[in-house]
Amino acid sequence: MIHFLPANMKHNKITDSDLATLTNGESNFVSDVWVNGKKIVDRDITCKNGYIHKVEGVMTSADNMADIVASHANMKTFNYLLGRCSAPYYDDAATKEYNRLYNNTDSVFVLRHFASTANTGNYGAATSGELAHDPDGQAVDAKLLYDPTWNQYIYSNTSGYDLHYDAGAMLVPSDKAFNTWWNADGKVLQDMYGSWDKVPMNVLVKLMNINMINTFSETVPSKFKNIVDNTTKVSLGLTTADVDSCFMGCNGVVYLLNKVYTPADYRSVSFPALINSNGADGIMSVIYWGIDNLNFEPYLNSMDSYYSLIIPTNKAMLTYVDPCSYGTNRTKLYRFTYNNQRKTVVANRYDYDLATGVVDEASKDSVTNADQVKDRLEDLIDNLIVVGNVEDGHTYYKTKG
């Protein structure tokens, strides 16, 4: 149950105008009390064995954020995109309880979203963790920030907070807003993939996650400036004028928007690598894995600086001469490849003759130390980032490395 109580709203600096937006104009004062979308019209009626609070209507259980999106007539596009990030998972505990109650022999499956914060436990034993594998145990291409179907969602924190302290929030563009964006700022995706069905998950999730907010209390309308791009941490510029209406769920609030905010990932120099990094079929999946996993995104997605990025293809990543082996008796060559099952980059190392350009295939040695792979990739990417442009006729340029 979602409670809007005066003391709590004061503590979280929720204003009268915030409450007006959240209740779609039904309340304008934080002195009001709201429980699950219903206003308390007479409170603290004292009885011999407790208190009665009179509400203005019949109070019903609230849907979660995913259910709100699924049932709204103007959120069909966002609901479809959410569905691409989900799968039904067999729940053994729920199956046993269901069959016990109904004397049946059926199986119970629970819809869950691939997410960095999700319920990884079974029925009756919720556990917060990362859901990074599909029901068959295969690693997924990308994850949402959190699972909007989890009724007990609370962001990961070190303060010991549980679901009673806060909730999530979702910015859901209307179908009309999505159609407008698809033919304007999103035209590059339309030109490359043709339809939403064909946009790869690792590309799509960038757009989804910019609309998923970990905390509700810190991002109410008066604090919209706190809603930032996931990588650049620059404010999106969301205003109440962009909000059509609000819907309170049991695990967070859903804001229906009349516009789509484009993630910085779609405008940065690394975008060509992103859209060519789709698993085993991507021709730049190796280098983009490095950009995505070695914390280069905040740097490359910055719109306040000008960079040039040299992007090697997967084929080029088979010919990396290890600079650490220069000046030694045996120069080493790395062949980096993308392991689509594990969703990670692996490498083999070979002896290499610099003079002849011949690789000694018999010297193949698998690099089992993941940190060594990351170290070489990080050094390489540092030297692929040029400060400024590379079109002014100079022979040498300053790199990040």
Show the residue positions of the predicted features:
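Mature, structured domains of secreted/extracytosolic soluble proteins
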Residues: M1-G401
